[in-house]
Amino acid sequence: MAIERTFSMIKPDATKRNLTGAITKMLEDAGLRVVASKRVWMSRREAEGFYAVHKDRPFFGELVEGMTSGPTIVQVLEGEGAILKNREIMGATNPANADEGTIRKVHALSIGENSVHGSDAPETAAQEIKYWFSDTEIVG
């Protein structure tokens, strides 16, 4: 499997509970390496832009409110099959359906406060990385 990069986000519901280190450790323990990371407090415009794909969905307003409610950690992860590996470590979107030992099973509060986001494909990984990072901020 090829070395690839993916985008990862630790959401405000997790940062407010001081889970940044615990979640990052789970990612690193699975063989992913953090090659870029920063703490941001999303503006409404940034959240609406990042989640524009969901703008017509009924949960969009609640999503934007949640993402602007506190600090977020945005990261670029690197490793073999990083996109799929990150998705597996995160677990199902609904923590009730997530496998034991996944980030969402261990740390998520609900489907809306599910602690993390990760890219689902190479194209979205590239877009999401570019949304938050310049090339000079990614050091690996």
UniProtKB/Swiss-Prot annotation:
Keywords: ATP-binding, Cytoplasm, Kinase, Magnesium, Metal-binding, Nucleotide metabolism, Nucleotide-binding, Phosphoprotein, Transferase. Pfam families: NDK. It comes from Rhizobium johnstonii (strain DSM 114642 / LMG 32736 / 3841) (Rhizobium leguminosarum bv. viciae). It is found in: Cytoplasm. Gene3D superfamilies: Nucleoside diphosphate kinase-like domain. Its cofactor is Mg(2+). Major role in the synthesis of nucleoside triphosphates other than ATP. The ATP gamma phosphate is transferred to the NDP beta phosphate via a ping-pong mechanism, using a phosphorylated active-site intermediate. It catalyses: a 2'-deoxyribonucleoside 5'-diphosphate + ATP = a 2'-deoxyribonucleoside 5'-triphosphate + ADP; a ribonucleoside 5'-diphosphate + ATP = a ribonucleoside 5'-triphosphate + ADP. Homotetramer. The active site is at H117 (pros-phosphohistidine intermediate). PANTHER family: NUCLEOSIDE DIPHOSPHATE KINASE, NUCLEOSIDE DIPHOSPHATE KINASE DDB_G0292928-RELATED. One of its GO terms (cellular component) is cytoplasm. One of its GO terms (biological process) is CTP biosynthetic process. HAMAP family: NDP_kinase. ATP binds at K11, F59, R87, T93, R104, N114. Its EC number is 2.7.4.6. Belongs to the NDK family. This is Nucleoside diphosphate kinase.
